[in-house]
């Protein structure tokens, strides 16, 4: 039961009141997407890039004047994005079935498109660790139909979580027991890896939860994988973790905030299903939210962890 309900927030636990201030409201920044996903913040340029997957384009929102423009079209049905430690865009591309990096001169570098000689399924979401390794999920969504990619059989025959070694580019499986691995993020100290499984989209009794793994001391493998939180409305898709270790999880009724102990603290209420989020703004305290058709934002009393 909610302790408090405003036009923008639902307080479930009193701890949420320290994170979501009652006088701040959700803003709609843009509408007109077919399916918004994968927001990524560019601090140097003060702009946000996100995907409109079925429309095969990426959009850009500028903080300075609030304008929205096409960043890239076609976009290879790009889904999730992140920004690496050098400030370059790293993207998951459905159509090309790869993880790519956009260089400063605009050239595109393929970081991974195969594992053990076989094509990846359709990379979905991606994160870069402080050691510069790239971790990504590879479910089947982009090869299930032509709507968000290219209907094709899986060459790998499994939906895995992978790591790209920063020294030699080698691609290794770090977790394989998933139905549909989706969003992923590290805890602030990078000792934990959280991964969403949205397998209920393919199996009626499939998972709709986030799992938590312990990262090995060498940063190359994980162990554990217990269920951290189960989504009560829809699925937990993309998410981010703040400096205090709270998870900000996209869900069917908005954004759920779960503490590091797994308990639900509260919700940011959005009038459509949410697919992904990211922190941005000069103080990294503005949460950008990709609803189905629209881009939203809200200022919070917390922020993203500092980058190494």
Label each region the model flagged:
Residues 1-308:
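Sequence-structural signature of mature extracellular/luminal beta-sheet repeat domains
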């Amino acid at each position: 039961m909610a302790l408090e309900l405003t036009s923008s927030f639902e307080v479930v636990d009193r701890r949420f009141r320290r994170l979501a201030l009652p006088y701040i409201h959700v803003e709609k920044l843009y509408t007109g997407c077919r399916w918004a996903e994968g927001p990524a913040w560019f601090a140097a340029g003060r702009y946000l890039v996100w995907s409109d997957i079925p429309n095969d384009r990426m959009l850009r929102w500028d903080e300075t004047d609030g304008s929205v423009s096409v960043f890239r079209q076609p976009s290879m049905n790009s889904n999730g994005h992140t920004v690496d430690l050098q400030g370059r865009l790293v993207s998951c591309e459905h159509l090309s079935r790869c993880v790519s990096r956009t260089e400063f001169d605009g050239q595109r570098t393929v970081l991974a498109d195969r594992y053990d000689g076989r094509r990846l399924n359709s990379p979905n979401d991606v994160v870069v660790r402080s050691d510069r390794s790239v971790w990504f999920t590879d479910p089947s969504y982009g090869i299930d139909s032509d709507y968000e990619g290219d209907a094709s059989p899986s060459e790998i025959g499994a939906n895995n979580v992978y790591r790209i070694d920063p020294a030699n580019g080698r691609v290794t499986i770090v977790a394989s027991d998933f139905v549909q691995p989706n969003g992923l993020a590290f805890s602030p100290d990078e000792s934990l890896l959280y991964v969403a499984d949205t397998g209920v989209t393919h199996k009626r009794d499939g998972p709709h939860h986030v799992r938590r793994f312990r990262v090995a001391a060498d940063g190359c493998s994980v162990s554990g994988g217990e269920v951290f939180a189960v989504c009560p409305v829809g699925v937990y898709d993309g998410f981010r973790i703040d400096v205090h270790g709270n998870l900000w999880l996209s869900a069917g009724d908005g954004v759920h905030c779960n503490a590091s102990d797994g308990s639900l603290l509260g919700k940011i209420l959005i009038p459509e299903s949410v697919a992904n989020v990211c922190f941005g703004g000069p103080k990294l305290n503005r949460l950008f939210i990709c609803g189905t058709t629209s881009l939203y934002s809200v200022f919070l009393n917390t922020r993203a962890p500092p980058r190494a």
